[in-house]
A protein has these predicted regions:
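Cell-envelope/glycan interface and biosynthesis
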Residues: 1-140
Length: 141
């Protein structure tokens, strides 16, 4: 992809903005059913896996979340929320993640970008507010 803006938006479909990953809060995890993984297989965290070898696990997890038995864990990357692709394997512990969401400072992140040698830096600096509206803030629950 030659256009830096298009490149950034394509990457953000599956990857967080640098410094804005919910995993960095320490409250979010990616989860799979290890007992379903064939020997030698490397998990890719894809929709195909969720609808294949991990389907029984994700069906069970969906039932637990929907019935309020998930102990504060929720799926944040779901269809129709923001522009990131759904990630049924990604769970957030909301009681703690909400604390970090309140402390998140977009201007601080912008300052870090301005001082860092990072690919597509101009796009990130010029469009960070709009990118955050699509790729960060929709997932703050």
């Amino acid at each position: 992809i030659d256009d830096p803006e298009e490149l950034v938006k394509t990457i953000l479909i599956w990857s967080a903005l640098p410094g804005a990953s919910r995993h960095h809060f320490g409250t979010d995890i990616d989860i799979v059913d290890a007992s379903s993984i064939p020997e030698g297989y490397e998990v890719q965290l894809t929709p195909e896996e969720c609808n294949g070898m991990f389907k029984p696990f994700h069906d069970w997890l969906t039932r637990e979340i929907e019935s309020g038995n998930s102990f504060g864990f929720e799926r944040v990357f779901i269809p129709g929320r923001g522009k990131i692709q759904p990630e049924p394997w990604h769970l957030s512990y909301l009681p703690a993640s909400r604390i970090f969401q309140k402390e998140f400072n977009l201007q601080l992140l912008k300052g870090l970008y301005s001082e860092t040698d990072i690919a597509c830096k101009e796009v990130l600096l010029d469009q960070l507010d709009d990118l955050a509206k699509d790729y960060i803030f929709p997932y703050f629950l």
